[in-house]
């Protein structure tokens, strides 16, 4: 891991800032971001997760946090902590059912506040759960926070892969390294026959990684317990450390730690 502290217009001290991105919604990006963060914490790193998905914040629910952040003597918000991970999300500041009906400039101001107006302290890794797509928020964060790299999350379907490619191209244009691509919902293991079923096709993300010369980080299967734990606010990689899926996350986290 690099020892250099990253500082930027969005002022935060972190040795590595990694964006978790997807070209479209519904591919499990936030689920990956949360479990990736707690896995890095389990490996001994100091971790923060910033929920940059202003319009659809998921981190509060997935991390099991319902409290509101307080302000310290420096007039900065103190991140909320669960499972040893520092967390900040617009979802902590508005009611869960209240939509953020904001235009671009207000979104940018909110994102800057979550960087500069939060007492993050020094971190080994800040994980940013980006909103889906390739719009203003993604570009601003990529250009203003000096990202160490990004991880692209996709499902095997062709339409998801097409949008993932757009994300790869965006990061290439703003000179942010793509550290790898993950194929989520890659397959399903039947509880009865124990056979592997590739419901949404399989292997597309790996083919795209080879085409773009990007590391393929791994395949994560569909698992009902993963969904249940997310809804309960208990990240799967905390509650089921010895599960096969947790081992996949550990493998991915170690690959990223070796690169950064």
Please name every model-derived segment.
Residues 88, 111, 130, 143, ...:
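Glycine-rich phosphate-binding loops of nucleotide-dependent enzymes
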Residues 1-23, 27, 253:
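Extreme N-terminal, non-catalytic leader segments
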Residues 94-141:
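Phosphate-binding/switch loop-helix module in NTP-utilizing enzymes
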Residues 46-97, 108:
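Phosphate-binding loop that captures ATP/GTP phosphates
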Residues 232-243:
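C-terminal boundary of histidine-terminating zinc-finger modules
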Residues 253-260:
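Short, hydrophobic alpha-helical segments
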Residues 16-51, 168:
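Walker A/P-loop phosphate-binding motif and the immediately C-terminal alpha-helix
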């Amino acid at each position: 891991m690099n020892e250099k502290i990253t500082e930027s217009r969005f002022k935060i001290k972190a040795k590595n800032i990694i964006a978790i991105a997807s070209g479209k919604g519904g591919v499990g990006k936030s689920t990956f971001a949360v479990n990736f963060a707690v896995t890095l914490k389990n490996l001994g790193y100091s971790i923060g997760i910033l929920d940059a998905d202003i319009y659809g914040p998921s981190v509060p629910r997935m991390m099991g946090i319902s409290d509101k952040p307080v302000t310290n003597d420096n007039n900065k918000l103190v991140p909320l902590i669960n499972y040893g991970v520092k967390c900040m999300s617009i979802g902590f500041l508005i009611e869960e059912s209240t939509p953020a009906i904001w235009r671009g400039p207000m979104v940018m101001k909110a994102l800057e506040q979550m960087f500069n107006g939060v007492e993050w302290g020094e971190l080994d890794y800040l994980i940013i759960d980006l909103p889906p797509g390739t719009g203003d928020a993604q570009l601003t964060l990529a250009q203003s926070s000096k990202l160490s790299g990004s991880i692209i999350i996709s499902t095997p379907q062709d339409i998801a892969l097409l949008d993932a490619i757009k994300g790869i191209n965006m990061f290439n244009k703003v000179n942010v390294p793509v550290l790898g691509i993950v194929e989520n919902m890659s397959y399903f293991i039947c509880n009865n026959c124990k056979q592997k079923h590739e419901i949404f096709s399989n292997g597309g993300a790996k083919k795209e990684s080879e085409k773009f010369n990007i590391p393929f980080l791994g395949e994560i299967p569909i698992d009902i317990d993963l969904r249940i734990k997310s809804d309960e606010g208990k990240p799967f990689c905390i509650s089921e450390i010895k599960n096969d899926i947790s081992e996949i996350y550990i493998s991915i986290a170690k690959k990223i730690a070796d690169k950064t």
